[in-house]
C-alpha cells in the first residue's frame, strides 16, 4: 500500500487537526481514532495488515486528536472539544459509507456522535465500556502520567496539559448519562472489541449488550490499548466487519 497523504483541517475553534490518508480518491471510508495519549501512528500497522482487496476499496483515515501528535495544542481538552473535532472530520470527509473505529476515548467519541445523529454508518469500539469504571479510568491516567515522567518516547508528542488531566475525565463523569442515551439510540452496525486484560470485563460486555442489543462482540488477548497490542488481530476483525455490511 502506498505511503499515506497528510491531511490538515481546522477544528471549529481553529485548532489544526492532522490525519494520514490512504486511497485518497475512494469514498468508502474507515476513520481511525486513537486512544487518549496515542497518536495516529498506532493505526499504521493495523492498516498494513488489511488484505489487499479491502485496501483497494476503502479510504483509510488515521487522525490525531487535538493535543496529540501533529495536531495543534489547545487551551481546552473537554469531551465537547473532542466531539466537535470528530464532527469536523465527518463534515470534511463527506463519505458514505463512513465507518468509525476508535480505541478508548476515540471509540467513546464515535459512539456519542453516532447516537446523537452524526452521519456515521458503522461503529467499531475498541475496549470502550458504556459506563467506564472510575478506578480503571484513573489507573489509565496514572499509567500515562508515569510514562510521561519517565520520559517515555510515546509521550513526547502529547501536550503536557492533556497528560496532567485537563478536566476530561471529570467532564465525562459529570454527564455520563449522555453516553448511556447515545448507546441506547444506536441503530447502525456496532462492534465492540474487548481487550481481555483491558477495562472491558464480563460485566461491561453484558452491559453493552443490554444497551446495544444488536451489537457484535469480539475478544482479543490484549490490554486496554487494543490496536497497539494486536494490530493484526484488530485488522482481521475490522476487515470482517467491513465486508459483512459493506461488501461492494
Predicted regions: what they are:
Residues 1-16:
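N-terminal cap/lid segment of alpha/beta-hydrolase-fold proteins
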Residues 15-70:
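Conserved HGGG/HGGXW glycine-rich cap/lid loop of the alpha/beta-hydrolase fold
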Residues 58-101, 236:
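Active-site loop/oxyanion-hole signature of alpha/beta-hydrolase fold enzymes
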Residues 102, 106-107:
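Catalytic nucleophile loop
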Residues 108-115, 119-150:
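Flexible "cap/lid" loop of the alpha/beta hydrolase fold
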Residues 133, 138-185:
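The alpha/beta-hydrolase serine catalytic core
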Residues 168-212, 218-221, 225-227:
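Conserved serine/cysteine hydrolase catalytic core
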Residues 215-248:
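Catalytic active-site module of serine/aspartate enzymes centered on a nucleophile-bearing elbow/loop
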Amino acid at each position: 500500500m502506498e505511503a499515506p497523504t497528510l491531511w490538515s483541517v481546522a477544528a471549529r475553534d481553529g485548532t489544526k487537526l492532522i490525519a494520514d490518508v490512504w486511497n485518497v480518491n475512494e469514498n468508502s471510508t474507515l476513520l481511525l481514532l486513537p486512544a487518549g495519549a496515542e497518536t495516529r501512528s498506532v493505526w499504521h500497522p493495523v492498516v498494513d495488515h488489511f488484505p489487499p482487496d479491502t485496501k483497494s476499496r476503502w479510504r483509510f483515515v488515521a487522525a490525531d486528536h487535538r493535543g496529540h501528535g501533529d495536531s495543534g495544542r489547545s487551551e481546552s481538552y473537554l469531551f465537547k472539544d473532542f466531539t466537535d473535532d470528530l464532527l469536523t472530520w465527518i463534515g470534511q470527509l463527506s463519505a458514505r459509507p463512513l465507518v468509525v473505529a476508535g480505541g478508548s476515548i476515540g471509540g467513546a467519541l464515535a459512539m456519542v456522535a453516532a447516537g446523537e445523529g452524526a452521519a456515521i454508518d458503522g461503529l467499531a469500539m475498541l475496549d470502550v465500556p458504556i459506563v467506564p469504571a472510575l478506578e480503571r479510568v484513573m489507573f489509565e491516567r496514572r499509567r500515562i502520567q508515569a510514562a510521561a515522567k519517565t520520559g517515555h518516547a510515546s509521550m513526547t508528542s502529547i501536550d503536557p496539559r492533556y497528560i496532567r488531566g485537563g478536566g476530561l475525565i471529570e467532564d465525562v463523569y459529570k454527564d455520563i448519562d449522555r453516553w448511556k442515551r447515545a448507546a441506547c439510540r444506536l441503530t447502525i452496525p456496532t462492534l465492540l472489541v474487548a481487550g481481555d486484560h483491558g477495562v472491558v470485563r464480563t460485566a461491561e460486555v453484558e452491559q453493552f449488550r443490554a444497551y446495544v442489543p444488536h451489537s457484535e462482540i469480539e475478544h482479543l488477548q490484549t490490554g486496554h490499548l487494543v490496536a497497539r497490542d494486536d494490530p493484526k488481530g484488530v485488522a482481521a476483525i475490522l476487515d470482517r466487519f467491513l465486508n459483512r455490511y459493506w461488501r461492494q
